[in-house]
A protein has these predicted regions:
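Short, conserved catalytic or adaptor-binding loops enriched in Gly and charged residues
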Residues: 36, 87-90
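A common structural junction motif
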Residues: 37, 79-84
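Short loop/turn motifs at secondary-structure junctions
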Residues: 41, 91-93
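Short, flexible helix/strand-to-coil boundary loops that buttress conserved ligand/catalytic motifs
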Residues: 75, 84-87
Length: 115
């Protein structure tokens, strides 16, 4: 993933759908979520499958915005509001949302070792 530049926002959410893994209902939900990419201002959109046994979440969504105004516009967009109300809230069992912006730069010695 490219480095997040000053002023940009990375919106991420990890989640577990309430549908059975691999089910048609799960696939339909993910297809509906993929349409969020079409909302103006959304960049670098990805739907990701969790591979680590370190948590119980099954998927992640990541996207970027040019700035806070673009992110606010996305949050208020009718398609996003509709998706959250009609699909997300009734079909997601658990989730964690985290929004990032660039922080202090550290040298290589601080970024080695992973998390």
């Amino acid at each position: 993933m490219a480095e997040l530049r000053n002023g940009r926002i990375r919106h991420t959410v990890v989640f577990t759908p309430s549908h059975a893994p691999g089910s048609e209902a799960e696939a339909d939900f993910l297809a509906a979520a993929a349409q969020l990419e079409d909302i103006p201002g959304v960049e670098a959109f990805e739907i990701l499958r969790e591979t680590s046994p370190k948590n119980a979440y099954r998927f992640g969504i990541s996207m970027e915005f040019a700035d806070r105004a673009a992110y606010a516009s996305y949050n208020e967009h009718p398609d996003h509001v509709r998706f959250v109300g009609e699909r997300w809230l009734p079909e997601v069992a658990d989730f964690l949302e985290i929004d990032y912006e660039p922080s202090v730069r550290f040298g290589a010695s601080h970024s080695e070792g992973g998390s």
